[in-house]
Amino acid sequence: MNKEVLKMLTEKKSNSNFVTVECLLAFDKDEDKGRVLTLMRKFSSMVRFAYKSILHGAERKELKKLLSRKYGINTRYSDDAILLAKQNLESCLEGNQNPKKLVFGSRELFEQLKKKHLAGKSRDTLRQKWEERRYGILYSRGDKSREGNLNLRLVNLNNQWCLRVNLGNGE
C-alpha cells in the first residue's frame, strides 16, 4: 500500500476553509505504527537540524535540499521543518531567550531528568514524556494549488474518517 491509513477518532473544525484535526491515532498494524513513528522521529530531527543550521546562517533554499537528501523525505516536509525551526527561533528572540540554549522537548522536563535522585519507574515515565515531546512532531501544511495537503490527508473509507500519511519517501 502506497499510503498508510490511520483511523481518525476526533475532529474539530476551525473555519469554513480549513480543518484543524486533534486526534488519537489508532493503527490497524504494528508495522504502520512503526513507520509513522519513524517518520515523526525523522521530522523532529529535521526541525532540530534546521534550527541549528539557521542559527549558523543557512539559506532556506539550500537547507531544503540538504534536509531532503539527508533524511530521505520529500521537500514539503523539509519546508515545513524549516518553518517550525524559524518559528522556534522567533519565539526565543521575542521572549529575550538565548536561542543557542533552546531545549527541544521542554527544558523543564529535561532539567528534571538531569537530577540524579530520580530512578526506576518515575524516571522512565518522565523520560518517555520528554521523548514524546522531543520526537513526536509531525507537521505539514496544505497548498491551495494542490487542493490541500498532500502529506496528510483525511479520507472517508466506508463512512469512517481516516488519515492518509505520506511517508515522504515515495511510500
Residue ranges and their predicted role:
Residues M1-E171:
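Nucleic-acid substrate recognition interfaces
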